[in-house]
């Protein structure tokens, strides 16, 4: 399926590949709906959310030692269509925040949907404090 950018001629659809991650099922549907409103692909919406909210998330997390894989209840596999450069950019932001791709995308998606940064960080902090959970 062509993305908004490929339809505008900025990227060929063949330049993009599946990039997998897991999201809470309810959040996944909210992200799909938000992208749909803008007539964007989910990948484009996630990239925009990461660009807008990634720096704020990184600042809010500070030096907090987080679990790299917080447990996700009712997780749903999600495939984003991204170029290699877009995937690397997303992963670089995740690593800078001390998170894996799924946790980072979950956090910036929640921020992009209007949740407060303190609530998102508190949930990550709670995951960091749960003993005996190795992702």
State each model region's role.
Residues 1-25, 58-85, 94, 132-135:
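Short Lys/Arg-rich basic patches
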Residues 3, 21, 35-36, 80, ...:
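Intrinsic disorder/low-complexity segments
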Residues 32-34, 62, 91, 105, ...:
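General helical structural elements
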Residues 40-63, 99-123:
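Short, basic amphipathic alpha-helical segments that act as recognition/interaction helices
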Residues 72-113, 117:
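Conserved small-residue-rich
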Residues 123-135:
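Alpha-helical oligomerization segments
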